[in-house]
Amino acid sequence: MTDVAEEAGWATAKTLAEALPYIQIYDRETVVIKYGGHAMGQEDVAKVFAADAVLLKLLGVHPVVVHGGGPQISRMLDKAGVKSTFVDGLRVTDEATMEVAEMVLSGAINKEIANWITLAGAEADVRGVGLSGKDARLITAEKVTRTKKDPDSNIEQAVDLGFVGEPTKVDPQLIEALLTSEHDYIPVVAPIGVSPDGDTFNINADTVAGALAGALKAKRMLMLTDIKGVLDGNGELIREMTIEQARALIDTGVATGGMIPKLENAIHAIESGVEAVVILDGRRPHAMLVELFSEYGAGTLIKR
């Protein structure tokens, strides 16, 4: 063994020893992971994510994955010649778009992520289980209503978003059964919901993750994004904040674009019983492990 290899071994042992207190903190605790962004479409990054999820399970954590798929849906709609329009960041979803969205989310992305997890955990028999909110009525949803101000009359007008929904009820029994099974299952949930009448709805994945984390009373919700976390007015990373400070970022306009719904869903999750939410860069290898098992973590921690 070379000196370099020996030093690397000692460094690995030191890292594992330093992680012990954090491993004990998360033992048998549920962590909901919102997996999305452009990193989800990169096979090498997806394999690292799957391996990290398996490692969490083997360390005693109960990971639950909720995934998005906006870019993949857009590509499929383009191929089908279906034009997309958006209101407040939500895709207007007619019947044809809903059919494509469900096919991509539940039929392609969901099963691919579950398969990567199963492959990564094959030696230890850790398995990914692909689900959508329609399974066992995991997510009951209703139609989203939005208004938009007419630029000419300055009057708020209702906007029909089609089959875009928001959760009204989350029944976590199926997820809890998988997590407490004698087998090592990792649930992977597509953000599709169903109304009491059986209508299918496309739901924002951040919203689903927050609602599910609240229903499961998760220890943490990790929101993997394409940026390093929440930034202040100077573009610097905010390491930690309260939900009051998160609201202030929204109210003062410091938080913009896609960060607004992320903060809103983080606030809602914490108010529903989640201990803390972390917004972090999912493109960085092993970001989840750094956040959960190191002193300084990664990204922005939001707590009550």
Curated annotation (Swiss-Prot):
GO molecular function, one term: ATP binding
Localization: Cytoplasm
Keyword Ligase: no
Pathway: Amino-acid biosynthesis; L-arginine biosynthesis; N(2)-acetyl-L-ornithine from L-glutamate: step 2/4
Binding-site positions, substrate: 69-70, 91, 202
InterPro entries cross-referenced by the UniProt entry: AceGlu_kinase-like_sf, AcgluKinase_fam, ArgB, Asp/Glu/Uridylate_kinase, Glu/AcGlu_kinase, NAGK-C
Biological processes per GO annotation: arginine biosynthetic process via ornithine; L-arginine biosynthetic process
Gene Ontology cellular-component terms listed: cytoplasm
CDD domains xref list: AAK_NAGK-C
Enzyme superclass (EC): transferase
Site feature Transition state stabilizer, where: 34, 262
Keywords, sorted A to Z: Amino-acid biosynthesis, Arginine biosynthesis, ATP-binding, Cytoplasm, Kinase, Nucleotide-binding, Transferase
SUPFAM superfamilies for the chain: Carbamate kinase-like
Enzyme Commission code: 2.7.2.8
Catalytic activity: N-acetyl-L-glutamate + ATP = N-acetyl-L-glutamyl 5-phosphate + ADP
Entries under Pfam families matching the protein: AA_kinase
Signal peptide: none
Family (UniProt): Belongs to the acetylglutamate kinase family. ArgB subfamily.
Function of the protein: Catalyzes the ATP-dependent phosphorylation of N-acetyl-L-glutamate.
PANTHER family: N-ACETYLGLUTAMATE SYNTHASE, N-ACETYLGLUTAMATE SYNTHASE, MITOCHONDRIAL
Record-linked HAMAP family: ArgB
Protein name: Acetylglutamate kinase
Organism: Caulobacter vibrioides (strain NA1000 / CB15N) (Caulobacter crescentus)
Gene for this chain: argB
